[in-house]
């Protein structure tokens, strides 16, 4: 990728990451239960922002480089890398929150234990807490981040196709 594209990607990826961190912090301060897994206002805003920010960043790129004729691959790379940088920053921030705020971790354990108890009633909360704490190690968070990139690939392909069709 050309240097001018990489600067654009890193710049917009950092902006996306900091906006996602700001939204996470806002919901964390308002009510930390929004950060728990599931479909809620936080997850909806997070996904909508992720998609629309990438779309509008790509539109800015196209307007800045109007004289060039770019292909789908270039659009896809730019869009995906913006999401990659933004979600990485956001994921690392969430990891810090869960590892340094014991109350948030306990809320997570209680929330997921209530679902786990339906599946396996003999599982104690201490066993479940140990299981969950293993999932919040740095390596497991990186692994979780990699799986987060799968939907980002799909979003990038759709956004790139839309930009290519609009152009």
Feature locations, PLM:
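Alpha-helical transmembrane spans of integral membrane proteins, capturing the lipid-embedded, hydrophobic core
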Residues: 12-21, 47-51, 79-87, 91, ...
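Membrane-embedded or membrane-proximal helical elements that form or frame transporter/channel pores
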Residues: 30-45, 129-146
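Membrane-helix interface/capping segments
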Residues: 56-75
